């Protein structure tokens, strides 16, 4: 009897793994397509955007970790992130243009 050779399936390599990113490239791609920003989208655009988002996030978290450490805390709190964005001129300019700030305290309800 002849034996059948079993082919080993290759593991699927995600676009995030190919680009060595932690952020999900496929999800960024889906958001770009659903957002109707353009009729056509290059295959490298979501990879680049995911890389930029990952860079900004890691930069903010690194600075917030330093602020938390200097205040004697072991965890990063929203106040630490807020302080980083307010004290860093480039980050402040970036988030200032967004309109509504997530760092402002919410207005109390009248209920």
UniProtKB/Swiss-Prot annotation:
Pfam families attached to this UniProt entry: Histone
GO molecular function: DNA binding; histone binding; protein heterodimerization activity; structural constituent of chromatin
A GO biological process held by the record: nucleosome assembly
Gene knockout outcome: Male mice are completely sterile due to defects in spermatogenesis. Chromatin in mature spermatozoa shows defects in density, due to impaired histone replacement by protamines. A significant proportion of Prm2 remains unprocessed.
Protein location: Nucleus; Chromosome
Gene Ontology annotations for the cellular component aspect, listed alphabetically: nucleosome; nucleus; pericentric heterochromatin
UniProt note on tissues of expression: Highly expressed in adult testis, mainly in spermatocytes.
InterPro entries registered for this protein in UniProt: Histone-fold, Histone_H2A, Histone_H2A/H2B/H3
Swiss-Prot/TrEMBL keywords: Chromosome, Differentiation, DNA-binding, Nucleosome core, Nucleus, Spermatogenesis
Highest taxon above the source species: Eukaryota
SUPFAM superfamilies assigned to the protein according to its UniProt record, in alphabetical order: Histone-fold (SSF47113)
Gene3D superfamilies membership: Histone, subunit A
Role this protein plays: Atypical histone H2A which replaces conventional H2A during late spermatogenesis and is involved in the replacement of histones to protamine in male germ cells. Core component of nucleosome: nucleosomes wrap and compact DNA into chromatin, limiting DNA accessibility to the cellular machineries which require DNA as a template. Nucleosomes containing H2AB1 only wrap 130 bp of DNA, compared to 147 bp for classical nucleosomes.
Subunit structure comment from the entry: The nucleosome is a histone octamer containing two molecules each of H2A, H2B, H3 and H4 assembled in one H3-H4 heterotetramer and two H2A-H2B heterodimers. Incorporated into nucleosomes during late spermatogenesis. Interacts with H2BC1/TH2B; preferentially dimerizes with H2BC1/TH2B to form nucleosomes.
Further information: In contrast to other H2A histones, it does not contain the conserved residues that are the target of post-translational modifications.
Family: Belongs to the histone H2A family.
Designated name of the protein: Histone H2A-Bbd type 1
The organism of origin for this protein: Mus musculus
The gene coding this protein: H2ab1
């Amino acid at each position: 009897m002849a034996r059948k050779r079993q082919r080993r399936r290759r593991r699927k390599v995600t676009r995030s793994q190919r680009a060595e990113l932690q952020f999900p490239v496929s999800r960024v791609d889906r958001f770009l397509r659903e957002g109707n920003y353009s009729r056509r989208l290059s295959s490298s655009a979501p990879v680049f955007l995911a890389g930029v988002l990952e860079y900004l996030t890691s930069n903010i978290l690194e600075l917030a970790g330093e602020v938390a450490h200097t205040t004697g805390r072991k965890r990063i709190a929203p106040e630490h992130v807020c302080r980083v964005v307010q004290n860093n001129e480039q980050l402040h300019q970036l988030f200032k243009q967004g309109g509504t700030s997530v760092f402002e305290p919410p207005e109390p309800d009248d209920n």
